Amino acid sequence: MVLAKLLIIDFSLPGTISNDLNFKTMNINFSRSAIRLAGAFVATLTFSMIAPASASCQDDKEILGAGSSFDYPLFTKLFSEYNKVTGVQVNYQSVGSGAGISQLTAKTVDFGASDAPMSGKQDSALSGPAIHIPVTAGAVVISYNIPGVTNALNLTPGVLADIFLGTITTWNDARITALNKGVALPATAILIAHRSDGSGTTNIFTTYLAKVSADWNTKVGKGSAVNWPAGLGGKGNEGVAGLIKQTPGAIGYIELAYAIQNSMPFASIQNKSGKFIVPSTASITAAANIPIPADSKVSLTNTDAADGYPISGFSWVVLYKEQNYNGRSQGKAANLVKLVSWMIHSGQQYSNALNYAPLSPAAVKVGDALLKSVTFGGKSIL
């Protein structure tokens, strides 16, 4: 039997909210003999409609990834463009960073995508070493739905932490109004919208809050999944964006591209230098202008950059360093490495238009070095 995975997505702009806020994957079994005898065409939603010439060629040119919803708008564009020039089909499941790493651990996907570096516990669950390749940088923005207010609010680290701790409960609280003079903020109750799944976006946001608020660090901490003091959970950036849009008084955290594509307001956040910074590709780039360690695992939250947006983060493609496993072919392994190399080089040209920051030369250099360490049967692929 052949197992086909179908990724069902909305054909509107990537990240645009539809009635179904969750992406779904279906498993369908096909009989090889039935396909041979009937000569049937099996239609699957991928980034290509071109059928390969042979089964082995098809396997080599089909790559499956899963993970970060933070990356989904960018990945949709990248994988479509890559298919045009190579014929390689990339099927990507926007299931959240945690689920993506779980699927990589189980070896049911070729790569995982995560906005959080793997933890020691996650590393120990792998059957072999994995590498993290930075592929983009983005911003986690604070979006809200305040009746009658479309202004870009100013928020300090302390006020933001206390909102999510549940100690600031209405929009006309004196601490919020003092930062936003001239804005008529209503007495509407604040409702927190947060992620319900394991999330790299959550990791970026809670890492930031743990750095700027001792109360948050003590009571909640940081991670891809935390015990939220208050609020409602949504699955994926799509789900949280939907909760915010549908709920008067709501506030939540989502990736910048989702906010812009869905015309959602978002706050300027005060950074270490005391400046209120609007999240943008320029302010993300400024935050990312820091030394990159050899393993690429670095946080971009609350950096010293004078013009940097303080809730920024890298997103990584994660793959096994040794690619000879589960009967994989060398051709498939080579196509995976070539894909990731293209993403950090030619693929960067698509970042700005989708509100992601292109990688710095330093990040690309580290990514290149890591890709050169990937092997098949102990021999370097590149």
Task: For each feature predicted by the language model, list its residue ranges.
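Bacterial N-terminal signal peptides
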Residues: 38-49
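Flexible loop/hinge segments at secondary-structure junctions
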Residues: 55-382
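N-terminal secretory signal peptides that target proteins for export/translocation
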Residues: 1-34
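Intrinsically disordered/low-complexity terminal segments and short unstructured peptides
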Residues: 7-8, 15, 24, 43-45, ...
